[in-house]
């Protein structure tokens, strides 16, 4: 073709532009249907809701009719019916003449071609299609966010994903990709395999899923914590509990998480936590039984359970049943025969049984006894039933085997005791009565002959006299009281024929025994064999008395003496004195330098015997007192001199008895005590260290300010008007005196110094108070003295003129008129050794009889006749 002219090209372009505008206008005016969203292919995830809107684009919307949707099977989709039921797919008219396709939950089956159709002006059919393509979004079907593998095992960290198209999976640990080049981690379709899980494998794992076609990416965070299977680390194989007592046992387990522990009784498969008396702590595994029963015996299983697994271990509970003696009978056997006593007990374990005599601690051993082969202990055990038997056999039994026996049942739980009695029967026996004295009677007094027969069983007793049974004599003077085992024969000896022998005969099933008894006539004692003076003083006389040479049955109850002055021939006026046989025979109240006559007799139950052993004895003249006797018990070691030990270190109380005054009353005592030492057994006094004191009217003296752990020789002398007695001497030792040393260290001042300081302090305080009163208020002793010192002479004269004109000073009241002290024997400190001259009577005085007596405390002077102390018979 040739080239067009330039104006032709412009015309062509104008024509082309007009044609396009015409075509566009034509299209705008033609009716169509539009579907929103406008994409012809809609990709939507399964399970999600979907809405598609069909809108007519026509010149006249009112000419549109039959607007509807058709599904992928070309079925008309109906509108939603009335009510709550909602179909999976329905249509709904929207404002603006639009029709919406509503899909509540998209499924794979709903994918396909959908059409929207309508008619326009009843002449033209309108249709618009849209394709719905479904896909499955990434969905975690099995991917828990917390997963717990077990230590030492292989574990798959689950991460199951559902998606369409299929996703790709990769793993991260603590934010870092996991390398699968080694055998530790293996990616599987259902998760991540971890081989031989260790605690170091714990952490945060990320399961990441991606769909390339859809560009979807989703992550799942999984926390992995390694669990450890339970392990029982402490449970004894055997447990022991005591019946009736509380019990506790531990089943200790470890694991992760902390395992829960339970106890199962194998016999019943019962969890003991639900049983009575049982308590279980599931955290610590402690099982407690408030009171163990014998039925609790058996095997128990300890279960330790956590999310990693279960482990169990068995143990046996042995119940120690305390022994119980359920049979022990008293037994009886005859002498010389065999006797066996059996004790039966139960317990777990079966108790050991032994015996012992009541009141002793020694137990019999199994088998024959070493110290007594007659006794054998036979034990027997039944462990299955928990029972034991012990038999104590005594062959050739003796009377000494009779008595109480204690059965002892013993096991680990405790001891049980029960007492039984073995009775050994024997024939009557009178051996205990062979040493009894005869029975005495006198003056027809009734006598009691008692017969006691020892025997088991009790014996019956008969009395015989002169070969005949007394019960057959019908003698009213013979009365039998009791027939056994004790029987008394009351004899009324109205004539001498009843003073004779009687026979007691005892009988039981094992034999007979006889015992002879004598009834004798008693008489008064015979003459006293001897009575001689052993000690003479001016006022006392001590005798040694030997009883009658022959004793006529009854014992001596007392010795009597009659004494009178020898010049007096009448015994009816004599003095009487009696002594018990075990007392000193001392006659007191005698006159010095006087001769006396004495006679003696013995007394028993019958009466006083005849007087005899007549003798005369003179008392010596007045003299110094007898030697006083200290009332202390000395202690003698080996051959050394006896020593009296003081319980104190710094003082000692000397006590003595009042000696005989020998005719003159004792007026004082002289005590001399000297410290000393023993050198080679010889007593040596310390020079210039002796103390001498004299005391009156007392029989004790306390020596003070002594030195601890020191020997003292003490001499005691009594004094009367004649002189001093011979000295009584003892050696005394004080204790160590630790307490005295402690007191000396602490005590700075003596008691007198402390009292003086206290009085001085009080006086000083009074002086200060008086001085203050004088200065402040012009009162007090000092103020009064000052006022008197300042008075003028005229004031003094005026004061003197008051009253009677002079001051009268009354004399003090005279003391009570007391008699002057009586001086006995001259100066109290004089020490006459003997009587130089007789006593002189002052001129003009009347001579009267007088007595001076000393009763141990006071001196009494009496005038008049001297009367003896004892009454005359």
UniProtKB/Swiss-Prot annotation:
GO biological-process terms attached to the record: axon guidance; axonal fasciculation; behavioral response to ethanol; Bolwig's organ morphogenesis; cell morphogenesis involved in neuron differentiation; dendrite self-avoidance; homophilic cell adhesion via plasma membrane adhesion molecules; imaginal disc development
List of glycosylated residues: 74, 250, 330, 448, 458, 576
Bias type Basic and acidic residues, positions: 623-638
Modified residues (Phosphothreonine): 841
Disulfide bonds: 54-116, 159-207, 251-302, 343-407, 451-504
Transmembrane segments: 752-769
Gene that produces this protein: Fas2
Signal peptide: 1-28
UniProt-recorded Gene Ontology molecular function terms: cell-cell adhesion mediator activity
Lineage: superkingdom: Eukaryota
Record topology, Extracellular segments: 29-751
Modified residues (Phosphoserine): 827, 845
Cytoplasmic side: 770-873
KW Cell wall biogenesis/degradation (keyword) present: no
Biased amino acid composition, Polar residues: 612-621
Known function: Neuronal recognition molecule for the MP1 axon pathway, pathway recognition for axons during the development of nerve fascicles.
Keyword Lipoprotein: yes
Protein name: Fasciclin-2
Tissue specificity statement from the Swiss-Prot or TrEMBL entry: In embryos, both isoforms are initially expressed on the surface of the axons in the MP1 pathway and later on several other longitudinal axon fascicles.
Keywords, sorted A to Z: Cell adhesion, Cell membrane, Developmental protein, Differentiation, Disulfide bond, Glycoprotein, GPI-anchor, Immunoglobulin domain, Lipoprotein, Membrane, Neurogenesis, Phosphoprotein, Repeat, Signal, Transmembrane, Transmembrane helix
Positions of the Fibronectin type-III domain: 524-622, 638-738
Domain annotation Ig-like C2-type: ranges: 31-131, 138-223, 230-318, 323-423, 428-520
């Amino acid at each position: 073709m040739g080239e067009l002219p330039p104006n032709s090209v412009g015309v062509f372009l104008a024509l082309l532009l007009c044609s396009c505008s015409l075509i566009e206008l034509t299209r705008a005016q033609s009716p169509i249907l539009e579907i929103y969203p406008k994409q012809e292919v809609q990709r939507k995830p399964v399970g999600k809701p979907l809405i598609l809107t069909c809108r007519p684009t026509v010149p006249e919307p009112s000419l549109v009719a039959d607007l509807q949707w058709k599904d992928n099977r070309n079925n008309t989709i109906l509108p939603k019916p009335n009510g709550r039921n909602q179909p999976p797919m329905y249509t709904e008219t929207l404002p603006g003449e639009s029709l919406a396709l509503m899909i509540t939950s998209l499924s794979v089956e709903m994918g396909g071609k959908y059409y929207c159709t309508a008619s326009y002006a009843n002449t033209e059919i309108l249709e618009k299609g849209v394709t719905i393509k479904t896909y499955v979004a990434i969905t975690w079907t099995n991917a828990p966010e917390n997963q717990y593998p077990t230590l030492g095992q292989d574990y798959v960290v689950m991460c199951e994903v559902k998606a369409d198209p299929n996703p790709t999976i990769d793993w991260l640990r603590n934010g870092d990709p996991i390398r699968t080049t080694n055998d530790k981690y293996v990616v599987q379709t259902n998760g991540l395999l971890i081989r031989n899980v260790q605690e170091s494998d714990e952490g945060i794992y990320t399961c990441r899923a991606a769909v390339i076609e859809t560009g979807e990416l989703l992550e799942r965070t999984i926390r992995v914590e390694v669990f450890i299977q339970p392990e029982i680390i402490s449970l004894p194989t055997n447990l022991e509990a005591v019946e009736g007592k509380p019990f506790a046992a531990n089943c200790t387990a470890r694991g992760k998480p902390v395992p829960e522990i339970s106890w199962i009784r194998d016999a019943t498969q019962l969890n003991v936590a639900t049983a009575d008396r049982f308590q279980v702590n599931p955290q610590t595994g402690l099982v407690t039984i408030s009171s163990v029963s014998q039925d609790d015996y058996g095997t128990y299983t300890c279960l330790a359970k956590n999310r990693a697994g279960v482990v169990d271990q068995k143990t046996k509970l042995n119940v120690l049943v305390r022994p119980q003696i359920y049979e022990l009978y008293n037994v009886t056997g005859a002498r010389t025969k065999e006797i066996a006593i059996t004790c039966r007990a139960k317990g777990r374990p079966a108790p050991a049984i032994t015996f012992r005599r009541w009141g002793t601690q020694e137990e019999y051993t199994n088998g024959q006894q070493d110290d007594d082969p007659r006794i054998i202990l036979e034990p027997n055990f039944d462990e299955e039933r928990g029972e034991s038997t012990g038999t104590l056999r005594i062959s050739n039994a003796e009377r000494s085997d009779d008595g109480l026996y204690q059965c002892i049942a013993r096991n680990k739980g405790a001891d049980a005791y029960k007492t039984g009695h073995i009775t050994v029967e024997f024939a009557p026996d009178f051996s205990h009565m062979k040493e009894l004295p005869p029975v005495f009677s006198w003056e027809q007094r009734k006598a009691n002959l008692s017969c006691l027969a020892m025997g088991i069983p009790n014996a019956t007793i008969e009395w015989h006299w002169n070969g005949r049974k007394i019960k057959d004599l019908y003698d009213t003077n013979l009365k039998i009281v009791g027939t056994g085992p004790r029987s008394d024969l009351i004899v009324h000896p109205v004539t001498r024929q009843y003073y004779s022998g009687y026979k007691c005969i005892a009988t039981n099933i094992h034999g007979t025994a006889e015992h002879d008894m004598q009834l004798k006539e008693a008489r008064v004692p015979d003459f006293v064999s001897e009575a001689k003076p052993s000690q003479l003083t001016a006022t006392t006389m001590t005798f040694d008395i030997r009883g009658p040479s022959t004793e006529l049955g009854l014992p001596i109850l007392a010795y009597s003496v009659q004494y009178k002055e020898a010049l007096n021939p009448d015994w009816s006026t004599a003095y009487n004195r009696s002594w018990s046989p075990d007392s000193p025979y001392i006659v007191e109240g005698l006159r010095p330098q006087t001769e006396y006559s004495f006679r003696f007799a013995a007394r028993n139950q019958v009466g006083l015997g005849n007087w005899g052993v007549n003798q005369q004895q003179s008392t010596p003249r007045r003299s110094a007192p007898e030697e006083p006797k200290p009332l202390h018990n000395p202690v003698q070691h080996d051959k050394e001199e006896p020593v009296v030990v003081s319980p104190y270190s710094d003082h000692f109380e000397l006590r003595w008895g009042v000696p005989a005054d020998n005719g003159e009353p004792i007026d004082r005592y002289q005590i001399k005590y000297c410290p000393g030492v023993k050198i080679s057994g010889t007593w040596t006094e310390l020079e210039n260290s002796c103390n001498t004191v004299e005391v009156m009217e007392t029989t004790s003296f306390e020596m003070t300010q002594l030195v601890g752990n020191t020997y003292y020789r003490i001499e005691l002398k009594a004094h009367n008007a004649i002189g001093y007695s011979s000295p009584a001497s003892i050696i005394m030792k004080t204790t160590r005196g630790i307490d005295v040393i402690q007191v000396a260290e602490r005590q700075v001042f003596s008691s007198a110094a402390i009292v003086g300081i206290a009085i001085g302090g009080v006086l000083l305080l009074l002086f200060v108070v008086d001085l203050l009163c004088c200065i402040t208020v012009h009162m007090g002793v000092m103020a009064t003295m000052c006022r008197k010192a300042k008075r003028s002479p005229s004031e003094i004269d005026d004061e003197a003129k008051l009253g009677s004109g002079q001051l009268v000073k009354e004399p003090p009241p005279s003391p009570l008129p007391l008699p002057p002290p009586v001086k006995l024997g001259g100066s109290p400190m004089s020490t006459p050794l003997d009587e130089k001259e007789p006593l002189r009577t002052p001129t003009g005085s009347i001579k009267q009889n007088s007595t001076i007596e000393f009763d141990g405390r006071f001196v009494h002077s009496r005038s008049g006749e001297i009367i003896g102390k004892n009454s005359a018979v």
